[in-house]
Design a protein with these regions (language model features):
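N-terminal amphipathic/basic leader segments beginning at the initiator methionine
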Residues: 2-38
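Alpha/beta enzyme core
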Residues: 18, 30, 43-48, 54-344
Length: 344
C-alpha cells in the first residue's frame, strides 16, 4: 500500500514562492533603494520661477486665487530673486503690470517700465540669475488682447502683422535692459522670426528666445489673468491660441518656431498636454519647457487648504510627471516651495 504524504504548510509556501520569478518590489523595499533606482529627479535648477512686477506706485499684494504668489515692485522682485537663487533656482520669468494701458500696449517698451526696471535691478544684485521676460501685449492693452485690434467684416480681431512690429519693440526693450531671454507668448504667426531678426540687427544676438510654441486656448489660465490683470474685455483668444484638441498642429507650430530661430520651445499648459510634451521631446533636439500654469497651481492649493490632498506630495508628483513626460525646464509657481522642500 502506497502512502501519500500531504505537503506541509511550509512546502506549499515554497511552491508558491518558486512560481514568482520576478520580484520588482525588491527595488522598492527601502527609501535608499528607491532613490538609487529613481528614473526621474526634479531639481530646483530645472525650474523657472514666474514673477509679477508692478510699478513702484503700487504695493506688494498677494493674489487671492493663487495663495503664495504676489504682485511685487522691482525692489521686492530683486529680494525674491536673491532668495530663489540661494534656494537653487537659476531662472526667473518676469510679467509686467504697467502704470497705464492703451490700445497698442505702448507702455511695454518704456525703458523705465516695471519689467525693464526689474531686469536691471536683478542683473545688478543677482548677476548670475538668468532673467527671462514674457513678450506679449495683453497685460499692457486696454482691451486685454495680445495684439492690435482691427475690425474685419463687422468683427473685432487681432491683426497679426501689425502686432509683430510691436512685439519686436517690446522684446528689444527687454533685451536692452539686460534680459537673457525673451519669451513671446502671443501666438502670432512669424513672431519668433521677427524678434530674432530684430535682436540680431541691433547686435543683441546673445539674447535667446524661449518661444511659447504650443500655447493652447485653455481654461486653466483664469488665475493668471487676475494676477496679470490681463483678461480680454471682449471675446476670447481662440483665433490665435491653439485648439486643445489638436496635437499634430502643436508639432507643426513647434517646428515653425524651431525653423524661425527659437532656442527653447515650450508647451503650455503642462498637465493636460503631457502627450504633446512627450511628442515634442521625441521629435525635436532643442530644450523643451513646459508651463505648469496658474489653474493647475490653484487647484492644488485649494484642495490642500480643504484638507483633501497632501499639497506637498501632489506638487512633487505633478512636477515629476511633467519632467518624466520629457520637459527639460518647468515654469511653475511652486518653484520656491519646491526648492525649500528639496533642500530640506
Amino acid at each position: 500500500m502506497t502512502t501519500t504524504t500531504k505537503p506541509s504548510e511550509s512546502n506549499r509556501k515554497t511552491d508558491v514562492e518558486s512560481a514568482v520569478t520576478r520580484r520588482p518590489r525588491r527595488l522598492r523595499r527601502t527609501e535608499s533603494i528607491r532613490a538609487l533606482v529613481r528614473e526621474t529627479v526634479v531639481r530646483p535648477e530645472d525650474l523657472i520661477y514666474p514673477l509679477f512686477v508692478v510699478p513702484n506706485s503700487r504695493g506688494k499684494v498677494e493674489i487671492a486665487s493663487m495663495p503664495g504668489v504676489w504682485q511685487m515692485r522691482a525692489r521686492e522682485i530683486v529680494e525674491e530673486a536673491a532668495r530663489a537663487f540661494d534656494a537653487g533656482i537659476r531662472a526667473v520669468l518676469l510679467f509686467g503690470l504697467p502704470e497705464f494701458k492703451d490700445a497698442i500696449g505702448s507702455s511695454s517698451w518704456d525703458p523705465a517700465g516695471p519689467v525693464q526696471s526689474a531686469i536691471e535691478a536683478i542683473k545688478r544684485s543677482v548677476p548670475q540669475m538668468t532673467v527671462m521676460a514674457d513678450v506679449c501685449l495683453c497685460e499692457y492693452t486696454d482691451h486685454g488682447h495680445c495684439g492690435v485690434i482691427v475690425e474685419k467684416s463687422g468683427k473685432k480681431d487681432v491683426d497679426n502683422d501689425q502686432t509683430l512690429e510691436l512685439l519686436v519693440r517690446q522684446a528689444l526693450s527687454f533685451a536692452q535692459a539686460g534680459a537673457d531671454f525673451v519669451a513671446p507668448s502671443d501666438m502670432m504667426d512669424g513672431r519668433v522670426a521677427a524678434i530674432r531678426r530684430g535682436l540680431d540687427e541691433r547686435r543683441l544676438s546673445d539674447v535667446g528666445i524661449m518661444a511659447y510654441s504650443a500655447k493652447f486656448a485653455s481654461g486653466f489660465y483664469g488665475p493668471f489673468r487676475e494676477a496679470a490683470e490681463s483678461a480680454p474685455q471682449f471675446g476670447d483668444r481662440r483665433t490665435y491660441q491653439m485648439d486643445p484638441a489638436n496635437g499634430r498642429e502643436a508639432l507643426r507650430e513647434i517646428e515653425l518656431d524651431v525653423e524661425e530661430g527659437a532656442d527653447i520651445i515650450m508647451v503650455k499648459p503642462a498637465l493636460a498636454y503631457l502627450d504633446v510634451i512627450r511628442s515634442a521631446r521625441d521629435k525635436f533636439a532643442l530644450p523643451v519647457a513646459a508651463y505648469n500654469v496658474s489653474g493647475e497651481y490653484s487647484m492644488v492649493k485649494a484642495a490642500a487648504q480643504c484638507g483633501w490632498i497632501d499639497g506637498t506630495r501632489v506638487m512633487n508628483e505633478i512636477l515629476t510627471s511633467i519632467k518624466r513626460a520629457g520637459a527639460d525646464l518647468i515654469i511653475t509657481y511652486h518653484a520656491m516651495e519646491f526648492a525649500k522642500t528639496y533642500r530640506a
